[in-house]
């Protein structure tokens, strides 16, 4: 359950959402994407409120979610996965622009997505997102289980996206990586924001205390 969460992701910024398991990070992404409807509050893309709009409607507004499971179609080819992401009014356009960040996919356009490595599948998920010309990208553990070299490639592509003005909100298991790329950090614990600020405002001891819910543990011990 989320409580009194006020979160802003500005165009071109990279915002990291950190916290222990069960803190509400994935729930927050699902609310933003329209997969869950909040009982209170609002979700907006720019000045356009989208709280009651379906996920497909939010996607047309420029929101793209890359879930932890990557959200690709394993039985379809790479090319078919990409073509499915092309908006109806752009049908017939080339998928080539989506491959610029990950040239390795050019060699695998006819290959089924499920037969590729985990890193290549994540590259495909990102390429699908890039094709939709997103304004906001929500990323849930994009580096999960990937080799360091692949993680570097993926984050290079994401940072290039942010330089083009796309807003990024990421849930990331590697805290040091998240702090390195983020402009702003939110820490969640038990559904509430316990910290909001620049990565440089967090020292390691404070980060670990907040990340592990230290404030709440201390309060419980006092009582």
Model-flagged regions — what are they?
Residues 37, 49-70, 95, 107-110, ...:
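ABC ATPase NBD coupling module
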Residues 112-116:
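Conserved ABC ATPase signature
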Residues 141-142:
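Walker B catalytic motif
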Residues 18-20:
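The feature captures the beta-strand-to-loop junction immediately N-terminal to the Walker
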Residues 41-49, 61, 93-100, 195-197:
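Conserved ABC transporter NBD signature motif
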Residues 129-130:
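ABC ATPase C-loop
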Residues 33:
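Helix-to-loop junction immediately C-terminal to a conserved catalytic motif
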